[in-house]
From Swiss-Prot:
Probably acts as a transcriptional activator. Binds to the GCC-box pathogenesis-related promoter element. May be involved in the regulation of gene expression by stress factors and by components of stress signal transduction pathways. Belongs to the AP2/ERF transcription factor family. ERF subfamily. It comes from Arabidopsis thaliana (Mouse-ear cress). Residues 1-11 have a biased composition (Basic and acidic residues). GO terms for biological process: ethylene-activated signaling pathway. One of its GO terms (cellular component) is nucleus. This is Ethylene-responsive transcription factor ERF039. CDD domains: AP2. Pfam families: AP2 (PF00847). The gene is ERF039. It comes from the Eukaryota. GO terms for molecular function: DNA-binding transcription factor activity; transcription cis-regulatory region binding. Residues 39-96 bind DNA. Keywords: Activator, DNA-binding, Ethylene signaling pathway, Nucleus, Transcription, Transcription regulation.
Amino acid sequence: MQDSSSHESQRNLRSPVPEKTGKSSKTKNEQKGVSKQPNFRGVRMRQWGKWVSEIREPRKKSRIWLGTFSTPEMAARAHDVAALAIKGGSAHLNFPELAYHLPRPASADPKDIQEAAAAAAAVDWKAPESPSSTVTSSPVADDAFSDLPDLLLDVNDHNKNDGFWDSFPYEDPFFLENY
């Protein structure tokens, strides 16, 4: 009797085996969370390969259509502009490092947001380098300048420069418009 009750309790603890109800619409990689395309907030890919972006207006069912774009990064930048305009500093951005460089819409009107989003998507933004990735002055870079010939004239060395300055008369002003 004890064996049957322990057997029943084990059966209840197991999760039920899901029934297969046909083919899954997702590939194995998508089911595992692995995707070939980048995944940005507010961006999705159409079946024919174009990327679209839209954002939901707060406290409304409607969405603001931001456009169709050729790359997911363009669509993500458009979404970031709209998110900043609608949600302000609490917005979740795809590229937070570009937040201060993105165009701002003239107003919160959907038309203005769409125009600013299109402008942000059209520009090829390069992410600003982080402080850790900036190149500091190194001895190798300094050596490149030390190998150059001394092109600047030493004004204290009058022996070398006497003939050079004699070609410019003191009484005639030097005007660039004569050349």
